[in-house]
Design a protein with these regions (language model features):
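Hydrolase active-site cap/lid region
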Residues: 194-239
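Alpha/beta-hydrolase fold nucleophile elbow
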Residues: 174-187
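N-terminal targeting or regulatory segments adjacent to alpha/beta-hydrolase or S9 domains
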Residues: 1-72
Length: 329
């Protein structure tokens, strides 16, 4: 793996991102309480406000649309708070649309090929730009270091923003009269997509590409986030971090998902993944089975990054597109 401009940033609690009046309280206590109360009221935490942001449209030379709107979550950067998306419309009907949520540090243009393949099989695709990525990245960053950070509170806020931005995209598609909405998320986009899926009944089907139940464990054990762990482990244990980041962990909401009416959901993971280690994926699958949550499972014999290379990217794409075809058309 290339060590491309990864920077070990200082550890920070970031209590200001969860409380406006910490009053010099022990940050561990603040995050324990925040985690407990947020999980109990997660519908409110991930709620989409009733007031809608104005969505601006710009047509590209390929008759695709660039969208932008103001995020419902105010972050540390006004540049980040202007959400960006690209729409690849299927013009013959509005039977189905897919929200595509990319991986961490995805580059401009990533997933455009997938979106155009979805077009070819009669589906509209909306490719979302994650917080602190691409046009949303502040000038002082080279990587999206505020989305997954050694800052406990900032990471919570950033993932919440990603989820609410995703739900905003779903609502916009519903307002355009699409009959069925799906979501395809990869890596951190899988986590974001899962959180949106559990909290938004307007999403009819989902594909989660790379799977883990606990946000903290991926950061702690994954190869891609070694630089984040290096800062975290000086001040905090994995067990503590797992507790504090439960509000943004899919495993937290398994019972909530089990209580809902079944919706088609496919989980894709790889045997030799060093970023989402295989034991984390298997633990998640086990919890789905224990709760009798109907789901589809695909395991590919490659690694995290090789999933984006031939021939695995073709197989992965086929598994994504075919599932969407079967359940959203």
């Amino acid at each position: 793996m290339l060590n491309d401009n990864r920077v070990v940033r200082p550890f920070e609690w970031g209590t200001e991102f969860i409380s406006s009046s910490s009053n010099n309280a022990d940050p561990r206590y603040l995050f324990e309480e925040f985690s407990r109360t947020t999980i109990a009221t997660s519908d409110e935490y991930f709620a989409l406000p009733a007031n809608e942001s104005d969505v601006e449209h710009e047509l590209t030379d390929r008759n695709e649309q660039r969208l932008s709107w103001k995020s419902h979550v105010k972050s540390v950067s006004s540049q980040n708070d202007l959400v960006r998306a690209r729409v690849f419309p299927f013009k013959k009907n509005k039977k189905s649309a897919i929200v595509v949520v990319p991986h961490w540090n995805a580059r401009a243009g990533a997933y455009f090929d997938l979106c155009r393949v979805l077009n070819r099989v009669s589906m509209t695709a909306l490719r979302l730009t994650l917080p602190y990525h691409e046009e949303r990245m502040p000038p002082d960053l080279e990587r999206a270091d505020h989305l997954v950070a050694p800052n406990v509170g900032l990471t919570l806020q950033s993932v919440r923003q990603a989820v609410i931005d995703t739900r905003s995209a779903v609502r916009w598609l519903k307002q355009q009269d699409y009959e069925k909405i799906g979501i395809v998320g990869t890596s951190i986009g899988s986590c974001t997509g899962f959180l949106a899926f559990v909290h938004d009944q307007n999403i009819d089907a989902a594909v989660f590409n790379h799977v883990s139940g606990y946000f903290a464990d991926v950061v702690w054990k994954g190869l891609s986030t070694y630089h984040v762990r290096e800062a975290l482990e000086k001040e905090i244990s994995l067990e503590e971090l797992r507790q504090y980041w439960l509000p943004i962990s899919p495993m937290t909401y398994m019972d909530k998902l089990a209580a809902q009416a079944p919706r088609p959901q496919r989980y894709i993971y790889t045997l030799y993944d060093l970023t989402f280690p295989i034991d984390l994926s298997r633990d998640t699958m086990r919890e789905l089975r224990l709760r009798n949550i109907k789901h589809d499972e695909v395991v590919l014999p490659c690694g995290h990054y090789t999933l984006g290379e031939k021939p695995w990217v073709w197989i992965d794409g086929y598994k994504i597109v075919r599932f969407c075809q079967n359940h959203l058309r």
